[in-house]
Amino acid sequence: MSDIGTLSAKGRDRAGKGAARATRREGQVPAVIYGGRQDPVLLSLAPRLIHTEMRKAGFSSRLFDLTVEGGETHRVMVQDVQFHPVTDMPIHVDFLRIGKDTEVTVAIPVHFINETASPGLKRGGVLNVVRHEIEVHGRPDALPDFFEVDLTGAEVGDSIHVGVVKIPEGVRPVIAERDFTICTIAAPSGLKSEEAAAGEAAAAAATPAA
């Protein structure tokens, strides 16, 4: 996993939609820390801090030490970010408090590597991504920023399943009962046409003359 990030915030006194709107009018993003069998902590964050962290890999699976001005520091993960429907700006952030026994469920992005080492792609095959993310459950400190799928040697018609993905100890796929598909190498349209024509020719040759 990546290094633990740091965030700073100010506390706020009031909850509710009216208080959240007032926080936004002040140019801040309302937020809350909850979980860990403790009372929620109401916060306001500078928008630039959220934007900076969202541009980094593994934002949704990363641990943060969030320090409240004049208060304590909380170990947290981002649980949810709400966005404005028009501007797409963050308008509220939920943080989950992380304890020593906390486990979380998150979707981790999949990165594909060594595409140039795939004979199927070199022949014009198409990488058909079935899952852009893998939903996993586990300890926050064991979560990777992303999973890698190596396409070395992949031929047209091959399917790559979750069983070949390197998953850290302490992390497990939410779908555990089957080896689900991550991607396939599909035949290019030209090759499909050639194979179809060849199949039709073979069928015609095998048909007895009337």
From Swiss-Prot:
Molecular function in Gene Ontology: 5S rRNA binding; structural constituent of ribosome
Keyword annotations: Ribonucleoprotein, Ribosomal protein, RNA-binding, rRNA-binding
Single GO BP term: translation
Highest taxon of the lineage: Bacteria
Pfam families assigned: Ribosomal_L25p, Ribosomal_TL5_C
Stored CDD domains: Ribosomal_L25_TL5_CTC (cd00495)
Keyword field contains DNA-binding: no
Residue numbers spanned by region Disordered: 1-23
Free-text function comment from the UniProt entry: This is one of the proteins that binds to the 5S RNA in the ribosome where it forms part of the central protuberance.
Oligomer status and interactors: Part of the 50S ribosomal subunit; part of the 5S rRNA/L5/L18/L25 subcomplex. Contacts the 5S rRNA. Binds to the 5S rRNA independently of L5 and L18.
Family: Belongs to the bacterial ribosomal protein bL25 family. CTC subfamily.
PANTHER family cross-referenced by the UniProt entry: RIBOSOMAL PROTEIN L25/GLN-TRNA SYNTHETASE, ANTI-CODON-BINDING DOMAIN-CONTAINING PROTEIN, RIBOSOMAL PROTEIN L25_GLN-TRNA SYNTHETASE, ANTI-CODON-BINDING DOMAIN-CONTAINING PROTEIN
Protein name: Large ribosomal subunit protein bL25
